[in-house]
Amino acid sequence: MSSTSSKRAPTTATQRLKQDYLRIKKDPVPYICAEPLPSNILEWHYVVRGPEMTPYEGGYYHGKLIFPREFPFKPPSIYMITPNGRFKCNTRLCLSITDFHPDTWNPAWSVSTILTGLLSFMVEKGPTLGSIETSDFTKRQLAVQSLAFNLKDKVFCELFPEVVEEIKQKQKAQDELSSRPQTLPLPDVVPDGETHLVQNGIQLLNGHAPGAVPNLAGLQQANRHHGLLGGALANLFVIVGFAAFAYTVKYVLRSIAQE
């Protein structure tokens, strides 16, 4: 923060915002970082990292706080710059911690308090002036798109170089993941009805490798064994049947002779 910022803002506002800046550096707000413009301490920019288990997860949301010269006795105005699906972009937001409600403002509230209140309202679904209604799917899409969007913002890149590097690393990881070849076997049905699978670099035909020819000799031997066994059983049945028939004829002839 340069000395020019002190000349533009009243002493009370400057001193208070400097204290808040030191406090927020010592005790950061969860999911949020903030920096004042080097040329104007009355304009702060912030970045919200989308919290886990919310539609904003993975997103980066850039916005700004405009403090009045009467701060901390009057509240700031809050704007969201990055498309997010919750608030309109570049529009004053109507929250209890903004200049829309000076009657509810508490001069003891710090920049950390303001940013915490903003995040709390962001993850809720209550309507207010400056809010919009979108599906969770849309919010997740905007979360993904927020990375590239913010990198195009000059002020964002100048004030938050660490976040910029974080975003670039995340984009690199996403690109590497999307460029990886498909490892799952994918069926490829050819006109003759055969199904080809590619697994571990080997094309399988109907579940077998091309060189995996069935053991014909083994199959023939098994078939021959089954044929011999079936023939032996058939002969056995014929012999038993003939013996039973001969015994029956002999019994009948003996009965006739006795009569």
Swiss-Prot record:
Its main location: endoplasmic reticulum. Signal peptide: none annotated. GO terms for molecular function: ATP binding; ubiquitin conjugating enzyme activity; ubiquitin protein ligase binding. The chain crosses the membrane at residues 227-247. It catalyses: S-ubiquitinyl-[E1 ubiquitin-activating enzyme]-L-cysteine + [E2 ubiquitin-conjugating enzyme]-L-cysteine = [E1 ubiquitin-activating enzyme]-L-cysteine + S-ubiquitinyl-[E2 ubiquitin-conjugating enzyme]-L-cysteine. The keyword Lipoprotein does not apply. It is found in: Endoplasmic reticulum membrane. Residues 248-259 are lumenal. It is a single-pass type IV membrane protein. Belongs to the ubiquitin-conjugating enzyme family. This is Ubiquitin-conjugating enzyme E2 J2. It comes from Homo sapiens. The lineage of its organism: Eukaryota, Metazoa, Chordata, Craniata, Vertebrata. The gene is UBE2J2.
